[in-house]
């Protein structure tokens, strides 16, 4: 009996530890969407598209110039129990790179970049690339995903399922609307040609920046211009039914969406926390009394100033409501 109690207790401890992720020493998300890692990631600049490794020891996000002039992927790593300083990712810094996402096994990072495929490349578009983890715990050289996946047009926001299927944003001739979510099936070790995701997700308008559940049971994305749009683009969810078909997408609601643009969703690997980008302005007046110059300058240069920040919210219970 004592041995049984010991085993049960050990299993509980192991399960608890497995569920605990150190999100930059920020504690846990709450039922209200709040700025994530203020002063570390969200710092008053344009910070967007967050991802964390399956082991919870690496974070990537993007810093972007205004008007999408250029963007750079940033990197933070947990070593010896401590997070290091924010640095430019080892595979970024020269070109306009953004939207890094881990493969479910943590061995690859997929991202979008306008770097040229070779010296003969004359098309200035964004393609999808990947890097692989090296033996010394770094990242290798970027590899182009090839022209079955990539086109002469832009491809953005890769999201990879356990099956290997690749979801991304593009404007292709076989699309449904003005911008759509596409999927490339991974079959026999190769990516197949992109096909648009169901019209339960895609519309005649704009759908972009989709996160697919690694098990492909739900998908989150931004829709713009829909009848129930609360602002300049809202986050939506679609789940699969028992037949494996995507159901009609639903707006995630006012707990998450705002009057601004809400986009770039990422759900933690334990499916408890949603991270997303938003350019909502939470610092603007009106004020209860005249504001001082010092307070005004602080607000204008802090997260929530209308530039893009990373937000997070407790998601597991919310997910059950859809």
Region spans (language model):
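Bacterial Sec-dependent N-terminal signal peptides
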Residues: 1-21
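Short, conserved micro-motifs composed of acidic
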Residues: 19-322
């Amino acid at each position: 009996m004592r041995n049984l109690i010991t085993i049960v207790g050990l299993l509980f401890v192991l399960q608890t530890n497995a569920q605990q992720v150190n999100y930059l020493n920020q504690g846990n998300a709450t039922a209200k969407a709040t700025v994530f890692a203020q002063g570390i990631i969200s710092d008053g600049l344009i910070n967007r598209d967050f991802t964390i490794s399956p082991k919870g020891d690496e974070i990537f996000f993007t810093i972007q110039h205004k008007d999408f002039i250029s963007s750079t992927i940033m990197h933070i790593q947990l070593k010896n129990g401590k997070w290091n300083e924010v640095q430019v990712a080892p595979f970024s810094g020269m070109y306009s790179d953004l939207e890094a996402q881990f493969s479910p096994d943590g061995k690859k990072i997929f991202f979008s970049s306008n770097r040229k495929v070779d010296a003969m490349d004359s098309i200035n578009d964004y393609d999808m690339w990947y890097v692989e983890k090296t033996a010394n715990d770094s990242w290798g050289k970027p590899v182009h995903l090839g022209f079955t996946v990539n086109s002469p047009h832009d491809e953005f926001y890769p999201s990879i399922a356990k099956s290997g299927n690749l979801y991304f944003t593009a404007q292709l001739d076989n699309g449904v609307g003005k911008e759509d979510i596409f999927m490339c099936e991974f079959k026999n070790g190769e990516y197949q040609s992109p096909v648009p995701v169901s019209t339960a997700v895609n519309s005649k308008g704009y759908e972009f920046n989709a996160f697919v559940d690694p098990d492909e049971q739900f998908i989150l994305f931004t829709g713009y211009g829909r009848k129930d749009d609360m602002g300049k683009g809202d986050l939506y969810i679609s789940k699969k039914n028992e037949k494996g078909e995507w159901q009609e997408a639903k707006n995630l609601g006012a707990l998450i969406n705002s009057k601004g643009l809400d986009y770039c969703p990422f759900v933690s690997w334990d499916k408890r926390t949603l991270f997303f980008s938003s350019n909502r302005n939470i610092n603007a007046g009106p004020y209860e009394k005249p504001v001082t110059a010092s307070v005004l300058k602080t607000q204008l240069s802090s997260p929530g100033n209308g530039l893009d920040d990373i937000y997070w919210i407790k998601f597991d219970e919310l997910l059950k409501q859809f």
